Design a protein with these regions (language model features):
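A short catalytic or substrate-binding loop motif that flags glycine-/basic-rich loops and adjacent residues
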Residues: 81-83, 147-150
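Short, acidic, metal-binding catalytic loop of nucleotide-sugar glycosyltransferases
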Residues: 23-31
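Short beta-strand-to-loop element that shapes/binds the nucleotide-sugar donor at the catalytic cleft/hinge
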Residues: 124-147
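A short acidic (Asp/Glu
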Residues: 17-18, 46-47, 110-112, 137
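GT-A fold catalytic core of metal-dependent nucleotide-sugar glycosyltransferases
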Residues: 84-132, 157
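A glycosyltransferase accessory/donor-loop signature
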Residues: 1-12, 18-19, 29, 36-68, ...
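Short, structured active-site "lid" loops
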Residues: 49-93
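Alpha-helix N-cap/loop-to-helix initiation residues
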Residues: 13-14, 107
Length: 245
């Protein structure tokens, strides 16, 4: 099966994206296309039509608001521009295995081996976190939100040709509240394959493991105030310096 990787892009997290992309390529043992998932491109191509607006947060910064996701206890603010755009990946990839990951990850393992291990009977693979974040703020002053299957969607391997993913139409992606998309509502439980925790290890949240293949700085990357000493922060900074050299 064809293989591809899509990394979420947000202009406020350019350094994080650089680390994610360069660390992924550094560990690859075979050529796999890697591209950024850029909201402006998806809007201009007509793929992304979800209504959005902007609000100013408590730090005076603009934040994107997903209007379809607003409810009585949630104002619709999303942490990144790719919050809901990720669900377009099977449509863009069209065939084979397509990995999406948030931009605040660092790869320490070979994604080619991950692809080799997958079973095509599953529509999607992810790490099935039992992660209940505490209320409050996370990276860049973003509000921490809670929803079913929190962080499952931060690292998804889509089987683009799977029959079940035909239900993930452009209309569905562009009309459902984000919380429904993030809980993988178009799939039955048995259609979701499980990856080991090492493929989406949450810094500051997950229990220690010997050798995480992907470190996810979900609370904040090491260049953000308060997260400079996160686990694997020195490795992250070294990767950033290598990219910039």
């Amino acid at each position: 099966l064809q293989r591809s990787v899509f990394i979420g892009w947000d202009p406020r997290e350019a350094a994080a994206f650089a680390v994610a992309r360069s660390s992924l390529k550094r560990h690859l043992t075979q050529p796999i296309p890697v591209r950024g998932l850029v909201l402006d491109d998806l809007i201009s191509s007509g793929l992304y039509t979800r209504p959005t607006t902007r609000k100013v947060n408590g730090e005076g910064r603009f934040e994107m608001v997903d209007i379809l996701s607003i409810r009585e206890d949630y104002d619709g603010r999303v942490a990144t521009q790719h919050a809901n755009a990720r669900f377009l990946v099977p449509h863009i990839a069209k065939e084979g295995w397509a990995l999406f990951c948030d931009g605040d990850v660092m790869f320490r393992g070979n994604v080619a081996r991950l692809f080799d291990s997958l079973n095509p009977k599953y529509a999607v693979y992810c790490v099935k976190h039992k992660h209940e974040p505490s209320a409050g703020m996370k990276m860049d002053g973003q509000q921490q939100t809670r929803y079913a299957r929190k962080n499952w969607s931060s690292f998804l391997v889509f089987n683009a040709q799977h029959e079940a993913n035909r239900a993930l139409t452009l209309d569905l992606v562009n009309t459902l509240p984000g919380r429904d998309l993030h809980r993988l509502c178009w799939l039955e439980d048995g259609q979701i394959g499980e990856l080991g925790i090492e493929w989406n290890w949450l810094a500051g949240c997950s229990k220690p493991v010997d050798d995480p293949k992907v470190v996810h700085f979900t609370l904040g990357t090491p260049d953000m105030a308060g997260y400079e000493r996160s686990a694997y922060s020195d490795e992250w900074r070294a990767q950033l310096n290598n990219w910039a050299a």
